[in-house]
């Protein structure tokens, strides 16, 4: 019931995804071979709704509802030889041999388009195995070729075939200071254009913000991608915990969307997770609802490089996990809104939703996941857009894209489409609750003029 189909694409998506499955297996007591290894006492909770993310195969093995795709075999090989490599259904690993070479056009139009049917077949097969499919979650990055180009191609195809199912993406944006590839701004801009149109909810992530959390908060001196991905997977597991474990106040992907998206195009969210503590200082932290709330709303805790203090929250959602009083949760949430009222738009009263799930993540007594729709996310788009314009003005690197059959017009279009959400976020950041009345008055005045 309420299954979620997980799709990961490209190197980044596959690495985040495989970490995520380690976390989910751990929470549900599934070992790397797919067998259930929990105790009888835990089994009620862990197995009751394990089918949100797992299929039960013959012999009691649990198989992830996951589709893995890439245009080169490298990452798949390392997943296969990794700790949880044997848990995936072998047919669900779909990969090409050529690679997309960080080129969005290859992922979207040429190489990716050749492989996409094979991926869609697997997606259909998995979707048919579901009782009542709730939606899809896609992990990908926007800077490369496969995750961005082929990832957005897949999202639009799946959208066509399952228009009424939720489409949730975990999208890793290019970082402001750290760049992996020169053509990131092109790939990201072309992708955002697709995400605005075809995704329902986008959780925006960013390596630099994750590095900062690892340095500052977790006190890791040399954080690896594994550490970053672990942070992401904690958040991913938190977003869906209410579907998988019993809770006092449940939420699901659709409730999340209904409560977070005031206008259809404004669906890019910042995410955070608490408690984040360095390995040595865990025993000194008292886990209380106020402490969690404080850390969760902290700007340093956001996993993308946009500062919520530079904008205002349109809406936000907090998912608490663990044994706690819902009354206390509600009080803390109201408290946050009252103390920082200038950071919330006034034309959406009570714009924070909270949900409570009784089962905490492994090894913690309490935890909370934060998802916020803040107008400051436009900083991310703006930054990418500036880098895009700088290169596009000189037509730098364009021949790689036109050589795959793209047209310059597409770039111009993507650029203006990138500026749409920015303008829209800005417009609603400045809007006040009584704006509407002024407009009505003006409209009425015009009306009188015409009549007279």
UniProtKB/Swiss-Prot annotation:
Transmembrane helix among keywords: no
Binding site residues for Mg(2+) = 72
- Residues annotated as binding GTP are 11, 72, 141, 145-147, 207, 229
Q: Which CDD domains match?
A: beta_tubulin
* Subcellular localization: Cytoplasm, Cytoskeleton
Residues covered by region (Disordered): 414-452
**Record-linked Pfam families:** Tubulin, Tubulin_C
**What start and end residues bound the annotated signal peptide?**
none
- Cofactor(s) of this protein: Mg(2+)
Question: Which residue intervals are annotated with compositional bias (Acidic residues) in the record?
Answer: 432-444
Keywords of the record: Cytoplasm, Cytoskeleton, GTP-binding, Magnesium, Metal-binding, Microtubule, Nucleotide-binding
Q: Name one GO cellular component term.
A: microtubule
Extract the Gene3D superfamilies matched here: Helix hairpin bin (1.10.287.600), Tubulin/FtsZ, C-terminal domain (3.30.1330.20), Tubulin/FtsZ, GTPase domain (3.40.50.1440)
- Matching InterPro entries, A to Z? Beta-tubulin_BS, Beta_tubulin, Tub_FtsZ_C, Tubulin, Tubulin/FtsZ-like_C, Tubulin/FtsZ_2-layer-sand-dom, Tubulin/FtsZ_GTPase_sf, Tubulin_C
- Give GO MF terms, alphabetically: GTP binding; GTPase activity; metal ion binding; structural constituent of cytoskeleton
> What's a single GO BP term from this record?
microtubule cytoskeleton organization
Q: Spell out the family assignment given in the record's similarity comment.
A: Belongs to the tubulin family.
Oligomeric state and interaction partners are given as: Dimer of alpha and beta chains. A typical microtubule is a hollow water-filled tube with an outer diameter of 25 nm and an inner diameter of 15 nM. Alpha-beta heterodimers associate head-to-tail to form protofilaments running lengthwise along the microtubule wall with the beta-tubulin subunit facing the microtubule plus end conferring a structural polarity. Microtubules usually have 13 protofilaments but different protofilament numbers can be found in some organisms and specialized cells.
What this protein is reported to do is described as: Tubulin is the major constituent of microtubules, a cylinder consisting of laterally associated linear protofilaments composed of alpha- and beta-tubulin heterodimers. Microtubules grow by the addition of GTP-tubulin dimers to the microtubule end, where a stabilizing cap forms. Below the cap, tubulin dimers are in GDP-bound state, owing to GTPase activity of alpha-tubulin.
* Protein name per its UniProtKB record: Tubulin beta-2 chain
Q: What is the lineage of its organism?
A: Eukaryota, Viridiplantae, Streptophyta, Embryophyta, Tracheophyta
Q: What gene name is listed for this protein?
A: TUBB2
């Amino acid at each position: 019931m309420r299954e979620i189909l997980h799709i990961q694409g490209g190197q980044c998506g596959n690495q985040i995804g495989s970490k995520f499955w380690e976390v989910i297996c751990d929470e549900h007591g599934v070992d790397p071979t797919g067998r259930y290894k929990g105790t009888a006492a835990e089994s009620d909770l862990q197995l009751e709704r394990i089918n949100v993310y797992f299929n039960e195969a013959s012999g009691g093995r649990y198989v992830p509802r996951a589709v893995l795709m890439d245009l080169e075999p490298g990452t798949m090989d390392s997943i296969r030889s990794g700790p949880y490599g044997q848990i995936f259904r072998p047919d669900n690993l779909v990969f090409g041999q050529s690679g997309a070479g960080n080129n969005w056009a290859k992922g979207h139009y040429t190489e990716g388009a050749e492989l996409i049917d094979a991926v869609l077949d697997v997606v259909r097969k998995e979707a048919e195995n579901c009782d009542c499919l709730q939606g899809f979650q896609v992990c990908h990055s926007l800077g490369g070729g496969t995750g961005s180009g082929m990832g957005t191609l897949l999202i639009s195809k799946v959208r066509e075939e399952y228009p009424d199912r939720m489409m949730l993406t975990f999208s890793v944006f290019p970082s402001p200071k750290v760049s992996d590839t020169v053509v990131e701004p092109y790939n990201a801009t072309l992708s955002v254009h697709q995400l605005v149109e075809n995704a329902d909810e986008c959780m925006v992530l960013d390596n630099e913000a994750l590095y900062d959390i690892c340095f500052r908060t977790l006190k890791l001196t040399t954080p690896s991608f594994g550490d970053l991905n672990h942070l992401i997977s904690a958040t991913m597991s938190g977003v869906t915990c209410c579907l998988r474990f019993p809770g006092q106040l449940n939420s699901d992907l659709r409730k999340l969307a209904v409560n977070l998206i005031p206008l259809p195009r404004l669906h890019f969210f910042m995410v955070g997770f608490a408690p984040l503590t360095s390995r040595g200082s865990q025993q000194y932290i008292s886990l209380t609802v106020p402490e969690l709330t404080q850390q969760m709303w902290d700007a340093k805790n956001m996993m993308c490089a946009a500062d919520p203090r530079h904008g205002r929250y349109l809406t936000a959602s907090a998912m608490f996990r663990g044994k706690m009083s819902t009354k206390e949760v509600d009080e803390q949430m109201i408290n946050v809104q009252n103390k920082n009222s200038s950071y919330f738009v006034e034309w959406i009263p009570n714009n924070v939703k909270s949900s409570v799930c009784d089962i905490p993540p492994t090894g913690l007594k309490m935890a909370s996941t934060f998802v916020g729709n803040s107008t400051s996310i436009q900083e991310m788009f703006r930054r990418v857009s500036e880098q895009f314009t700088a290169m596009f003005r000189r037509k730098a690197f364009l021949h790689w894209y036109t050589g795959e059959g793209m047209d310059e017009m597409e770039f111009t279009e993507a650029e203006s489409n990138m500026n749409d959400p920015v303008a829209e976020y800005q417009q609603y950041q400045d809007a006040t609750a009584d704006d509407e009345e002024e407009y009505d008055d003006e409209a009425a005045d015009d009306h009188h003029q015409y009549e007279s």
